[in-house]
Amino acid sequence: MRCGDATQPEEWWDGQPFGAIMLDAPCTGSGILRTRPEVKVRQSENNLVLLQGQQLALLRATWPLLAEGGELLYTTCSVLAGENQRVLAEFVAGESSASPAALAPPTQGDDGLACAASPEGLTFFPSAAHQGGFVALLRKTAAVPTVTPRRPRRRRSVKSSEAL
């Protein structure tokens, strides 16, 4: 497991491709409004456009880190197609090695879990028992040029006269 700014992998990535990446992208939080109504106050159309740009940037920055045959799980706590299906459709259209993998919707139980499947992923709708959100799985079908990994910093030897 690695922790770092996903938009700047050259700062922390060691060059070893990942077999799996989970990308929990920043979003409007439209799927959690029932429990966090203050989220609605912070949103605007401009904010949605900004978030879509961040989501695409994160997908584009992390995709080269994924090994051929690897999978990227994309999640948001939003139910808006503009942050989910449209972002993924735009990414897949521009990335020939990205292939959406079908996800089977969970069976609906007595708890009122409502889910809609699309070619891009699954949208879960908020209910009395659940928060809403989106999940999609992308499979990498071919190797693509990767980010140049960081180079280990050389330690400069310090002369005893410089140490004082």
Regions found by a protein language model. Name each.
Residues 39-67:
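Glycine-rich S-adenosyl-L-methionine
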Residues 11-13, 33, 41-42, 63:
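Tryptophan-centered motif/residue detector
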Residues 4-7, 43:
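Canonical radical SAM enzyme core domain
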Residues 6-22, 26-28, 34, 49, ...:
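C-terminal catalytic and target-recognition region of SAM-dependent MTase-like enzymes
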